Structures are given as structure tokens and as C-alpha cells.
Amino acid sequence: MEEVITIAQIVHRGTDILSLNNEEIEALVDEIYSTLKGSNDIKNIRLIDFLFTLKDFVNHVRAEQSKLPDLSMPMEAYIRQLLVDPDVVPIVSEKKKELRVRPSTRKEIFLINGTHLAVPAEAPIEIYGLKLRLKSFSPQCFMRMAEIGSFSPETLGYVASGANLTNFIRVFMKCVDQETWKKNGEGVVVTTKENIIQFTHQYIELYKFLRSGGHSWLINRLAEEMVHRKLDREDQGSHISNIVETEEIEPEENIKRVIFFLKELSTMYSVSPVFTSGYMPLLYDLYRAGYLEVLWNPVEQKFLQHAEQREKEQMILQQVDMKLTEVITQARQYFKIMEEKIGRVQSDAIREILTMEGKVDDPNSILQEVIKACGKQEAELITTEYLNIKKQWELQEKNACAHLKLVKQLRSGLQYAELLKVLESIRVLYKEKNNTTNWNLCKACGFKLLCPHVDMLIQLQAAEASYDTMRTKLMKFSGINKEKENNQGLIYSYFCKICGEELAHFIQEDRTADVGVIGDLNSKLRIFIWQETMKACTFIHFGKLVDVKQFANIAVNVCLPLVYSIENIKKEEDYDPLTQLYAVIYIYAYILNLIYSSQKNKEFLTITIHGMKADSSLNAYVTFLLEKMMQQYSGIINQLSEITDQWIANNFREAFKKIIHQNGLQGLSVQDDTKVLLTEILLGPMYDYAATVARIDGSIPMHKPRTPKEAEYEFKTVIGRTPAELLSQKEFYDKIYTSKYRPDFTQLARLNDIYFQEESLRVWWGGRDEEKTSTLIYLRAYELFLKYLQNAPNFNSELAEFKTYENAYGEQKALLAQQGFYNIFDPNTGRADQRTRLFEYKRLPISTLYDERGLPHKWTIYVYKAVDSSQKPAEIEVTRKDVIKKIDNHYALADLRCSVCHVLQHEVGQLNIKKVQTALKASLEFNTFYAFYESRCPKGGLHDFQDKKCVKCGLFTYIIYDHLSQPELVHDYYNNYKDQYDKEKMSIRSIQIKKDMTTPSSETQPKPPQEPWTFDYGKIIKTAKILDISPAVIEAIGAMEGRSYADIREGQGAPPPPTSMDDPRLMAVDSAVRIFLYNYNCLRHVSTFNKPPMHVERLVKHLSYEEKEDLEKVLPNVVNEYHTTFKHLRVTDPASALLYSIEFLCVSFLTLYEIKEPSWVVNIVREFALTELNTIIQSEKLLSKPGAFNFMIFGEDFVCSGEDSSMDDISAYSSPGLFGEDIIDRLDDPFSIEDVDISLDVLDNLAPQ
């Protein structure tokens, strides 16, 4: 390989590199750096371009010198990072003279400072007399290159005029010593300082041009113009002489020097594998194949012949590909017509035959099989139908109706306002109005115009409906559902039954191993980003009222993928402080992008920071956000010792660039008044508190609303009006539910003290310290809110004080994060579950829930106080139904009173806790006592109630459950029979102990069934026919172990009938029946499961909650007397017990498979029965042929022949190798990627993480 002339050698002025020591190397690097830094000609040029050419210099010195300064990273990795990340700039450290890499600043990235230069689309360019035009580049292309910093305005002018190429060639020729060239035929660079700077500047400009795609244009244009014009040497030389005016050199020598330069340039890119996939593949390929001879001999016949032959081959390949595509399309259309005309069964049978013969894509073979199976008339019918369809395609292709342009605008537009206008124009052309079952046809041409689901989708998008709403409304068009599984869970896709377009999809995550409500990191980090974004709303000024939930949801969708894309963020059990810090950085970068977008696009909603002007500079916003971030999240930052302010600033800058690159400019939508009103009600603390109280006292269900009807019922119960009634009278909301008071947020920070009070609720709630106590904490917070209600004027100052407390609380929480580690066996997953938790008691006074009599509070009395002291009366107490009648805007809600003990809500802490505990214990004792004697009588036997009183013991029926209405009767009866109760309780305990110590008796003879059983072989035959298997396979359930599957299928080698009740076959078949019955009962009673099994949930996912409840009524009970009969036969006749279990399995299967009504259940039960019985048989197959894997479980088509595969060679199932005859097919493979250059960033993505 020829030695490459590099700029490093130029700057060194001829010094022998091999003779340099370490100090001289450092001095040389300093000299290069200072030369670039001090040159005015290259002031605005990024150092990446110049230092890039030091590759050969550094590699050469590293190979020859053994004591080099240690570089911060390997050279190959350094070059790779330069290519992959154009925003990384190498610098030379002033202290250690090492090559380092740091992120570039915005000033270095955007060099043009917003300047745009208009360039004609066909600017003339002249190179060696060849008058070319820039047809390959448009002005937009040049503008884009200028925007990303590839060119300065001056450079852009060079590109447009071609001066960068011609000037560079001139300077290159000036820098070549003429005498040396004539002697050796090689160029030696002249070492004057002016030539160095000029050469360097021109080289960098040319390199940028080539790197941006100019190499492709350069070679194509030179080759094309020279071949077509067929210039001879004299003409070419005359043109060159006109360009090179400064020196009298032979034209032929000039061309040789250009070839020398191009060869050297291509050689530089071929030194390392990194550059073979870089920016010069075309130039390198031309040089390697000898095509640069075009510059030397324009009429080279070999080049022309090769180009002509290659073009012919490409045309032939295109024709073959088009013909193949047409044939395959015709074959597929044949099958579609067959399904419609002669039936699905016959079509599948023909498809199976042709698939085995390898002719499934041959239309002629399809017609021949149709003639064999159905007759010649059916084949002619298929051919005629296909010709009609093809003619329809041709007519549609030639159609020039005006609706085509409108549909194209509709499907490619971005602004919903414009799309609605286009949609209105399209609706005018509808042949039928209000069509939702088929294509909307054009009344002008008669062809398909628009699918109804697209019409509805455009309307929903214009109304800014949520994804869930759109998916729900579009489901009525769904007719094709597909399901597949990936690492995230099951993906369900829904397709339109009219046009086949995808409507929606969602992921049902596999949560069988999750612990708690939120068990995976994705949900935790998503919630963290959502919560922190909502907190950021406190300092953001939106200008108008916006949907803050939409703001947070967009932030999650934007930031979450970017956080996960960071290399050192791993999806572990729980996210660490570093992950939280990255999430906060991207949240604030998203906020900065919103501010930046509102400044750039005036149509967007104006977004700024409270206290800052809307036209403030971007640097001011960056400074504020960085300071806010470091102040607000100092608790997180303090946990990371290696994090500095500069690190945060650098990552914030990179996050902002990534968000701009990925999302561009972003804006937010403004809410309407109706939505704002309902949102304020539902999210307000009053509604939340009222709904919580209503759930506690049983007015509404404990669970959240699951249907619109349940949501409307909850709203009406809590508010007193339906949403429609409330919206019609907004003044009603203003009068009753608007208060001038605000809560004292400083007191909320002191809620931490509640955790450490003496009395605990954990004793009374059986250890449920999360769900119940969280509700009590809310009630405690409301008590504080009422207690400090009068501090409304100091609200703003106290809010600021609360924010300072929040930081300290975060630090305290970080210190408490040193949690214990536990390995707990999880019975759901069958493996150890790793948890970290403090198991810390959350303590609240018991009087928050119960009064001094042990009764739960009922907060049903509302206490209103007059806003004005002159108003009479000063205080009003009303029930919920009287609020509308008696309360106006002169009164504000002040407190709640318990209707049981008449204590005010904020005074529950003053109740005597000892009395509450004593009353609760007494209540527990009474409950146990009266539950014990609910049916039995202390006098013996059962109660004999006459006129609601037992004539034997004197117990009244109304005191069994109500212990407070008649306390004297309750205590008298309790005192009379307490001793008797204690004796009977001890007697029961002693009997239980005696039972535990007694040796169990031997198994008694089981009772015979009520009806005798006789074996019916017809059930097995019928089941086998439905499953398309041999009856012998069903008979072999429980007896496949150790047998060849071929023998099982033929009924050979079956073991003799069992003779013992302990035969393992009986237990195996009985287990299969029990599994079938268990899964069936899960399906029948699916409405009772909080989380049903996945295979059952998949079957009923489309049913409503009411339909799931009806499954228990419409599905039959198939158990009957199975267990009784099996137990009896197992002891008396084991052989009959085996046959009975197998027959019962088939009878249960047929009972479910043959269900005819109701229609909405048929498909569910049939799919369940087929899946369950096939699973049992497939599981049994795995036990056949011990010592070898049974390929038959994948179906008979997988195995090469129907013979016994126990002795098959494993090589029959392995893929073709890379040696011998296998390599022949590989050479002819047109899809091989062996010779394709793969970009290094792709290789990085393929590397193991």
C-alpha cells in the first residue's frame, strides 16, 4: 500500500517522524493545536475535521514509539465515536497532552447563525472544462446541510459555484514540488506556511462536501459527462490549461496528479475497517475496480461494456421479479375466490396438498387440483372471477376521479382543522349517507371512496379524544383480531372488517409474578415521571387554562423512552437515585422544549415561568431550570457522590437536543369550560373527601367506577346532581361547592408525626397497614385542614415554607431507604421473591374510626358557618339531602359531625382512646358470644323461637345482631350464660385436640353411585373425530410413558388393564380430569376473580362484567357424580375406573363442544374445550419415547415421513451449514448480505448489553 500524505506530515515540515521522542511528539501536537487555534482562515471550522486527518500520524507514532502518553480511549473507539456522534468534538488537553472527548456546545454546532443563502436549482459548475449542473442537489438540500452545521455561508457559496473543487485542485498542484514529481512520479508537499494553511482550509471544505454526499455526485457527474461527450486528450487538456493559469504544466501531468490525489484519498479511507463503511464507499469502489481510468481514458470500452451489461442484468432481474409477484398475487387471489365460491374446507384441503408438493404459488397447479377435487366447471368459475377482479383493478388504476386527490390529502394531512374541511368535501361524494357497514362508494365514479372507520377516526382526532376513547368507539368496526406475545406480554391487534386496516392495539402484561398493585419498574418509573411533571406545574405559567394531565401524559411518553435509552440505565427491581435524576433532567428538558417551541411558533400556547417575561432568552430559562432542579432535588443529588453541577448541565443540554431531534416543536391544547368544570370537581379535595366518606359508610361501592353508569351514580350520590344537571346550572356549583378558604399546607408536612403516635390501628385491621391507614391519613389531613382553616391570608407564605420542608423530608426519606433484604417464597410463581421493605407500623389514633362505644363513625351531618359574622344563624347543621334547600353562598362548609356519637370531625382526637379500646374488645366478645349461640341454645339443642323469643333460654332475635339498642338485655343474657359459654368453648377445644391425637381409621368401602355406569366407546370415537386423531391416542392417556408415538397411534404395545387401585395410570387420568374441571369452573365463575388465570382471561376479555356474571347461569355443571363413581370403581374394579375417567373426559368435552345457545357463549366454550383437551394430549405425548425428543408433538407435517422417528438422524432437522455443498447455494443467494457494508452504529446496537 502506498504511503498516505497527511496534513500531519505537512505541518511537521519534513521532519522524520520515526526519529521523534515523547517530548518532541508532545511539542508537535502543541504546534498543530496552536496553528489551528491561531489561524484566522479557519476560525469557525470545527477541530474535528482537522484532527480527523491525524489518524495515520497517531497510528504510525503509536506503532513506532513504545513510551507514548496513555490516550484516554483506544484510537479505533475514538474514530468510531467521531463517525457515530457528529456532536462530539476532540480536543487536546492543555495539562496532559491527551486526546479526550467532550460534548460540543451549541455555539460550535450552529455555525451559520441563522443565515440562509438562496442557491439556484441548476447552478452551473465548471471542472476541467466540463460544464456541469447541480441537478443532484436542491436548494432545500443545501439549506439542510447548512442548518446542521456542515457548511458556513462562505462554504455554501463554494459548493454552489464549484469553486471549492477547482480551488482545491489548484492549491494541491501548487503544493506539489515539480522537480520531485518529474523524477519519481510522486508528489512531495512544499512546506511554506501559506500553502499549509490554504491547503488545510481547502481540504476541510472538500472533506465536508464529500462527507455530506458530494462524493456520489462528483463521481457520477465526471463519469457521465466524460463518457457521453467522449472528450479526447487535446480537448481535455485545453480546458485544464484554462483553469490552471499560474503554471505551465502539461495537461496530461495535471490529470495524473488528480488521479494521484483521488487514489491517496481513497487509500486513506481503506486503512481501517471503520472507514470501509464510512462516507466514501462509492469512491473507494470506483478506485478498486479501476473505474478512475475514465479520468485518464474517457473512451475506455471495458468500462462502457461492463456498465451496459450490468444495466441489462438489472432490467432482466426487475422483469423476473415483476412476473413472480404477479404470479404469486394471482395464486393468492385464487385461494380467496375458492373460499367464497366452493367453501373454506375444500380450499384448505387443496392448499395442504399443494403445500406438500411445493406448488402453492402456481396458479396452473391450483386449477388442476380444483378440477380433480370439484370439477372443470368450478375451475372455469374461479378463472372468470379472477379476470373480473383483474379488470376491476385495471379500471381502478386508470380512474381519474377527483375524489382520489381529496383522499390523498385526507390521509397525508397534519392539521385537523384542514382535515375536517377535506372530510366535508369527501362526504358530498358519498353514494349513501350514514353507511357504517361497508365501503362508502363515490357517486361520481362508483369506486370505493373511504372506509367508515376513517371518517369516524378523523372526527375523534379533531376532537382530541383520548386513545382509549378512540379505541372503544372504533371497536364496532373490528372483525379481525390477532394476538402475539413479546417480552412485554400479550399484544392484541384489532383490524377493520371492512378495509383490513389496523384500528388499535394494546399490551396485556403478564403479571403472574408481580407483587402488589404495581410490580414492574416500567409502571414505577412512569408514575414517578408523571408525578414530578405535575409538581413542575407550580412554577410554569401556561397563559391559558390547559389540561395538566395531558401535559403530564405527553411528558411521560416523551421522556420515558429516552430515559431507558441511556446506556447505564438498567431495568432492575427498583429504580435507583441515578435513574430518578435522569428522569428529572428529561422532564425539565421537555419543559424547556415547550418554552422554546412557544417562542418559535406563535400559534402555540404561550408558555413561560412565573416571574419571567415571555420573551426572555433561552439562556435565562436554562439557568432558572438548572437552579430549580438542583434546589428541588438536592436530596436525590446528595445520594450520588460523583455527580457534579457540570455533569447535570451537560446531561441537561444533551437531553434537550435529543427531545428536539425526536419530537421537534411541541404545543399544548386549551381546555374548554365544560371539561374544566368537571375536572375541578372530580380532582378537588372536597369531592375526593366526600367520595372517601361515602365509600366508608357504604353509600357507594368501595371500588372505583368500572362503567359509565357506575361513574354517573357515584357523581350523583356525592354531588347530589348528575353531570348534565350540574352543567346546566353552573351557579349551583358556585354557591355550594366554592369556598373562599384554602388549606394550610405547612401542616401537611407534619403528618410524619402521625406515624409515631403510641396507639396503633394495625391490631384492629389484621396487619393491613397500607390500604386502610392511607384512608385514615387522608381523614387526619382533613382534620388539620379544618383546624387551621382560618389561616387563609397566610396561604402563599405558608406554601413557600412547605416547599422548603419538602426538601428536608426527601433527605430524611433517602436516609430511611437503607432497607432490610428478605427472600420470601412466592407460591404464585414458585420461586423466591426478593423484596426490600422496612415493615414499619403506621400509627393513628383508633378514635379516628370508632367512638367510645366501639361503633364506627358516620360523617353524615354537614356543619356550615356563616361567611359574614352578621349573618344569622352563625352555624347551620344539615344532612346531605337538605344542603340544596338550606345552604346558599352566605355559608361555607366548616366541619362534619358524626351521626352516631355527635362528635365533630376535628375533635376525634379528644376522645378517650382507652374507652375506645375497651369498647372494641367488649364488642368483639359480644360478637363472638352471640355468633356462638346464634343457632344453638345454652339449654340444649336449637333455639325454639316463638314471638321472636326463645322459650327455653329467653334470647330475643333482635339482640343477636344489634347489641346497642337494648344494652340491658344484651348484658343480662351475656352474664347469665357466660360460664356455660366458657365451658362449651373448652369442651370443643378438648374434642379437637383429641381428634388430632387419634390415629386415622383405614379407608372405608366407598358408596356406590346412584346410577350404574356402562362404558360407551362411541364417545371416544366422536371425540377423536373432532380432534382429528386416532381413538387409540385418547385411550392411551395416562399410559404413553415409555412407548413410541407411532405405536400409540396404531394402538400397539398398550399395557394390560390396571389391577390395583394404586396403579399410576389411574392417578394420571384422574389428574387430567381434575385439571379440566378446575379450568372449566374458573371459566364459569370468572366474575368472582380479581385476576383470573391468563388462559381464561384471554377467552372472556371481550365480555362485559354482566356477561361474565351470566356465565355461571348459562354454562352447565358437568361434574355430576364423577368423584363418587371414580372412588367406587377404583376400589372395586380398577380397569373400569380407568375407562370411566377417559370416557368422562370425552363426555365433558362433547357437552361443551355441542352447546348451541346462547350464541355469544358458543365460540368461547368450544375454544376452551378444544384447547384444554389438546393440552392434555400434548402433555401426555411428551412422556413417549424416553431418551429422545419427540418431534411429533409439533404435528405430523414437521417430521419428514410417517415412520417411527425415534431413530431419525438429528441432522435432518438442522439448518444448512457454511461448508462444502452448502456454500454453493449461498453464493447464488441474491439476498445475501455478505458483501454489504454495515454501519458501525448498527453493530453497536447488536452488541450485548
From Swiss-Prot:
<comment type="function">
    <text>Together with the penton and the other minor capsid proteins (p17, p49), forms a complicated network immediately below the outer capsid shell, stabilizing the whole capsid. In addition, blocks IFN-beta transactivation mediated by the cGAS-STING pathway and regulates the transcriptional activity of IFN-beta. Mechanistically, suppresses the phosphorylation of host key adapter protein TBK1 and degrades host IRF3 in the cytoplasm.</text>
</comment>
<keyword id="KW-1035">Host cytoplasm</keyword>
<keyword id="KW-0946">Virion</keyword>
<keyword id="KW-0426">Late protein</keyword>
<comment type="subunit">
    <text>Interacts with the minor capsid protein p17 and with the hexon capsid protein p72 capsomers; these interactions form a rigid zipper structure that stabilizes the capsomers. Interacts with host IRF3.</text>
</comment>
<keyword id="KW-0899">Viral immunoevasion</keyword>
<comment type="similarity">
    <text>Belongs to the asfivirus M1249L family.</text>
</comment>
<keyword id="KW-0945">Host-virus interaction</keyword>
<keyword id="KW-1113">Inhibition of host RLR pathway by virus</keyword>
<dbReference type="GO" id="GO:0039548">
    <property type="term" value="P:symbiont-mediated suppression of host cytoplasmic pattern recognition receptor signaling pathway via inhibition of IRF3 activity"/>
</dbReference>
<keyword id="KW-1090">Inhibition of host innate immune response by virus</keyword>
<dbReference type="GO" id="GO:0030430">
    <property type="term" value="C:host cell cytoplasm"/>
</dbReference>
<dbReference type="GO" id="GO:0044423">
    <property type="term" value="C:virion component"/>
</dbReference>
<protein>
    <recommendedName>
        <fullName>Minor capsid protein M1249L</fullName>
    </recommendedName>
</protein>
<keyword id="KW-1092">Inhibition of host IRF3 by virus</keyword>
